[in-house]
Curated annotation (Swiss-Prot):
PROSITE patterns: NIFH_FRXC_1 (PS00746), NIFH_FRXC_2 (PS00692), NIFH_FRXC_3 (PS51026). The keyword Magnesium applies. This is Light-independent protochlorophyllide reductase iron-sulfur ATP-binding protein. Mg(2+) binds at S16. Pfam families: Fer4_NifH. Its EC number is 1.3.7.7. It comes from Picosynechococcus sp. (strain ATCC 27264 / PCC 7002 / PR-6) (Agmenellum quadruplicatum).
Amino acid sequence: MTMTLAVYGKGGIGKSTTSCNISVALAKRGKKVLQIGCDPKHDSTFTLTGFLIPTIIDTLQEKDFHYEDIWPEDVIYKGYGGVDCVEAGGPPAGAGCGGYVVGETVKLLKELNAFDEYDVILFDVLGDVVCGGFAAPLNYADYCLIVTDNGFDALFAANRIAASVREKARTHPLRLAGLIGNRTSKRDLIEKYVSHVPMPVLEVLPLIEDIRVSRVKGKTLFEMAEGDSMLDYVCDFYLNIADQVLAAPEGVVPSEASDRELFSLLSDYYLNPPVEKTQEDELDLMMV
């Protein structure tokens, strides 16, 4: 049975880089994986393929929306590690709806019987405040994964996405698998948030420059690690996420905080940060 994942997070947080590396990690675990980019920039799969692949919406327009004239090889491109890649594309700037494009993408892939061929399908989705259109992949997902960092804005976006998961979970068995902290040197604010809005934290990746560089190079960390074994430990973070997802976790239907409540919680943490114990304080406690 196919497992479907939807990856969300604040714009610029590193969703696509994270998604590509998770897709490769899943492939390394022997799964046949399809990654679907849901962003008008159509750059979700760039680090898997090394170039901007044509979008489904462009292909449909070229064929005058005659689905019967489209073959799998017209829209599905092979990426690193054997991961298959699709870019939904999007409507012209300032016009149309991204949700419609996602719907057309799913419709075409079903026409091609593509969904039945994969162990895991991963949607990499644009947007940090999830409108009805870009929440569409949640209609098909078993699990949502939220990429964040240790900052106010990213966690505020995560809370909004959690609200969308709760809403979509009313109509089908969608669960939030958990948060993924990306390129952050601390996790204290993440822990503060999940103590108030309970949800798993799948992994927190440290502030590793190679993660950012991989995006510019158009390569996953796994591909970069082939020439630099020092990066193997970075790949282990993504393999750990893949293992947790493949274990079919129970997940949660989150109960998000209200905007005012969250603003108060996180801003108070900035204004009144906890006092870190010094080494001398810890020694004093040990002597008591």
